[in-house]
Amino acid sequence: QKCKAMLVPHYFGLAKSLKEVRQWCDDRGIALIEDCAHCYFGQAGERAVGEWGDFSTASLSKFFPLPEAGLLASAHRSIKSLRLEKPSLKAQLKGCVDVIELASRYQRFTGIRPFLASFFKLKNIRSQQPGVSEVVTNREASEMMRDCDMARIDQAPLWAAMALKTALPRGRIILQRQINFARYATYFSDVLGAKPLFPIHENSVASAAPYVYPLWVDNPDSIYQALRAMKLPVFRWDRIWPKTPDLPGDIGPLWSHHVLQLLCHQDLNTADIDHTARAVLHLLKTQQAHRQPFST
């Protein structure tokens, strides 16, 4: 009775119709916030992504090569202009440099990449820290917040983020993510020890731009550690916020442990997908061999 708003996410970039949820909220006078953090493009059933909610939120940096930027939108209500502070000139320049550094790291700027690599290597020497384990285990809240600068919430996005959002084409992003998802699906349709989190069929992503391919693994820990050690584009939600309540029927803890998320990013090509998928299959096969006794 005290509920004023409900937040409903489209997980993994695989948007679903929110028709029943929308009706449930309307019947009770509850505002629906459509969480599109994983899902920037496509259809969610009868409506476009972001059009079910009274408000919708999205994360641009998950789909575009941006240093930052989130989105608040509404297909039904007016949104007052936010009075955001302009970032400092230093922050603006750093944002531009960060974009160039990331592009150089992923084989962009072919002609001048050696020069850029040397420059960024020198730049980063001062900020290098001792390595940490690739597998994160139950950090305290203060540690988890180190990568989250909440002092920025009153500041406008950087020039670099807004310029790239406006200039970059959408078609290639959508198509390559669909291709990558479909490629993963060919590997994991019938595998011992793992299965797609959701049923996959020919039209699963025909109207979507997938964020990841969610793969349920029965015994994930050793496999995940090996994949992370190989620096493959795979992750899972293994950071659960301290004091998160344990709610009946909540599948979040199970997913955070068992669901490996195989990235479908548009800059991953078929060879990248094949390499990652085959590594997963090899680890699964090795695991199964160790678990099952040999016949004599």
Protein language model features and the residues they cover:
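PLP-dependent aminotransferase class I/II
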Residues: 7-9, 80-296
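Active-site phosphate-binding strand-loop segment of PLP-dependent enzymes
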Residues: 1-84, 89-90, 265
